[in-house]
UniProtKB/Swiss-Prot annotation:
Belongs to the alpha-IPM synthase/homocitrate synthase family. LeuA type 1 subfamily. InterPro entries: 2-IPM_HCS-like (IPR050073), 2-isopropylmalate_synth_dimer (IPR013709), AIPM/Hcit_synth_CS (IPR002034), Aldolase_TIM (IPR013785), LeuA/HCS_post-cat (IPR054691), LeuA_allosteric_dom_sf (IPR036230), LeuA_bact_synth (IPR005671), PYR_CT (IPR000891). This is 2-isopropylmalate synthase. It catalyses: 3-methyl-2-oxobutanoate + acetyl-CoA + H2O = (2S)-2-isopropylmalate + CoA + H(+). The gene is leuA. Pathway: Amino-acid biosynthesis; L-leucine biosynthesis; L-leucine from 3-methyl-2-oxobutanoate: step 1/4. Its cofactor is Mn(2+). The lineage of its organism: Bacteria, Pseudomonadati, Pseudomonadota, Gammaproteobacteria, Enterobacterales. One of its GO terms (molecular function) is manganese ion binding. Homodimer. Gene3D superfamilies: 1.10.238.260, 3.30.160.270, Aldolase class I (3.20.20.70). Catalyzes the condensation of the acetyl group of acetyl-CoA with 3-methyl-2-oxobutanoate (2-ketoisovalerate) to form 3-carboxy-3-hydroxy-4-methylpentanoate (2-isopropylmalate). SMART domains: LeuA_dimer (SM00917). Pfam families: HCS_D2 (PF22617), HMGL-like (PF00682), LeuA_dimer (PF08502). It comes from Blochmanniella floridana.
Length: 519
């Protein structure tokens, strides 16, 4: 019979400690709501005694969360426990999580105590916390470097004192999977009352072992996994919960456990955490990276088109993604080109695949990735500057005021004759104003879907590179602009996107006319 693994999220406590700036109460609450929607069993949302701001955020989240258990961290000190209980008292379900170092190096060099004193502090603190709640978790800080005899001794004392959950952290990410699983096995062998508590693990990623150690702990009997969304956290980060959750789901045949997580919320939760914490997700990040369900190799693309299971061990819909991405690059084969043309509504008799594939490879070698509208242009036009630059920047002027409103005057060359069209608009900031003016001049009702700004050093200046995605009539179009002036780079990117849209419109018109003539 499969057993449940409790998912303990510490994004708002351990994860937040790694951020360059603290989250506001409002931002923390937004993340907490996302975690609750995801279905985490326990969310550790702060260290109440550490600051008035942390107390307020824990208190606010405790008042608003309905389903998940809300947890606060405390040292083995009465004052810490009192403050944590005060912050948590309005929660429907709450847990007090207390911790104490157990490794020789921490006890001697950090606390200047002996192990017997640690035992006494553990007993007293757990019993004291039990005055406020039956749900007390005790963590053996630096358990990964604690002697097994001492670890077994303190775990037994903690359970006898009333701790319902015993956490075994690999605080400095020192252990490797077979070593860490042996620690958990040893606890089950040597602590007679181990079945009276849930064994939890909290692994750090200093050697890249956090997820591996957590999985090995599950196999050894751990039934709570602590971690963070996207693996954010101190130093190299924590166990990435999305990876644990999907490993349990996909490899249930070996792990024989389950979680109560709503898997289809994983991607959205990851995005919320990334955006609010201002921590971009690496493209190759497992489960939630932009390349996680993307295929560029021609062999892989052909295999996926024939049967997704050839190269995909999970369905992207399981995490809330709608589709697999087959990127068009110089490594793509004819099958991928046909697939993208079919997605745009074209049949094989509409174009010559051999001719299209030749010019596609030339363009892919030049620019790396080719987008659908560029492929469409290759199929039905000579991919010339005439088509690429229907719109071109003549000049612009931006005037901003202290009220956060900005006025933009944009002058564009339009059409083959390069007639200048002008527009003046007001917006909330210079880029908003400029984009409104460009939309009015082009008469293309577009919506800005994504705006990314990257900086690069160029000679003695910092060059701003702007990447945008806009939507028009249900399709996405891209634009890139580079300049030492960020506003100009943004305008260049938008003009490129407008040119791509204009070109696609011309191709559609020409194709319809051709089809009409054939009939």
């Amino acid at each position: 019979m499969h057993q449940q693994v409790i998912i303990f999220d510490t994004t708002l406590r351990d994860g937040e400690q790694s951020l360059q700036t603290s989250l506001s109460v409002k931002e923390k609450l937004q993340i907490a709501f996302a975690l609750e929607k995801l279905g985490v069993d326990v969310m550790e949302v702060g260290f109440p005694i550490s600051s008035p701001g942390d107390f307020e955020s824990v208190h606010t989240i405790a008042q608003n969360i309905q389903n998940s258990c809300v947890c606060g961290l405390a040292r083995c000190l009465e004052k810490d426990i009192d403050i944590a209980a005060e912050a948590l008292k309005s929660a429907k379900k709450f847990r007090i999580h207390i911790f104490l170092p157990t490794s020789a190096i921490h006890i001697q060099s950090k606390l200047r105590k002996n192990f017997d004193q640690i035992i006494d502090m553990t007993t007293h603190s757990i019993r004291y916390a039990r005055k406020y709640t039956d749900d007390v978790e005790f963590s053996c800080e630096d358990a990964g470097r604690t002697s097994i005899d001492n670890l077994c001794r303190i775990v037994e004392i903690a359970i006898k004192s009333g701790a319902r959950t015993i956490n075994i952290p690999d605080t400095v990410g020192y252990t490797i999977p077979n070593q860490f699983s042996e620690i958990i096995y040893s606890l089950y062998k040597k602590v007679p009352i181990i079945d009276q508590a849930i064994i939890s693990v909290h692994c750090h990623d200093d050697l890249g072992m956090a997820v591996g150690n957590s999985i090995s702990a599950i196999q050894a009997g751990a039934r709570q996994i602590e971690g963070t969304i996207n693996g954010i956290g101190e130093r190299a980060g924590n166990t990435a919960l999305e990876e644990i959750i999907m490993a349990i789901k996909i490899r249930h045949d070996l792990l024989h456990v389950y979680t109560n997580i709503h898997h289809h919320e994983i991607y959205q939760t990851s995005q919320v955490v990334s955006q609010l914490c201002n921590m971009p997700i690496p493209a190759n990040k497992a489960i939630v990276g932009s390349n996680a369900f993307s295929h560029s190799s021609g062999i892989h693309q052909d295999g996926v088109l024939k049967n997704k299971k050839n190269y995909e061990i999970m369905n992207p819909k399981n995490i809330g993604l709608k589709k697999v991405q087959l990127n068009l690059t110089s490594r793509s084969g004819r099958a991928a080109v046909k697939y993208h043309m079919e997605k745009m509504g074209y049949q094989e008799h509409d174009y010559n695949i051999d001719e299209l594939y030749k010019v596609f490879l030339k363009l892919a070698d030049q620019k790396g990735r080719v987008f659908n509208y560029e492929l469409e242009a290759l199929a039905f036009t000579k991919y010339s500057q005439e088509y690429l630059e229907y719109f071109a920047l003549e000049s612009f002027h931006i005037h901003s005021t202290s009220s956060a409103l900005s006025n933009a005057i944009i002058n564009l060359y339009c059409g083959k004759e390069k007639k200048i069209h002008s527009c003046s608009t007001t917006g909330r900031g210079p880029i908003d104003a400029a984009y409104k003016a460009l939309t009015l001049i082009s008469k293309l009702p577009i919506k800005l879907e994504k705006y990314q700004l990257h900086s690069k050093k160029y000679e003695y200046n910092i060059l701003g590179q702007v990447n945008i995605i806009v939507s028009y009539q249900g399709r996405h179009f891209h634009g890139i602009g580079s300049n030492i002036d960020i506003i100009k780079a943004s305008i260049i990117a938008m003009i490129q996107a407008l040119n791509n849209i204009w070109q696609t419109k011309q191709i559609t018109i020409n194709h319809k006319n051709t089809q009409h003539i054939k009939k």
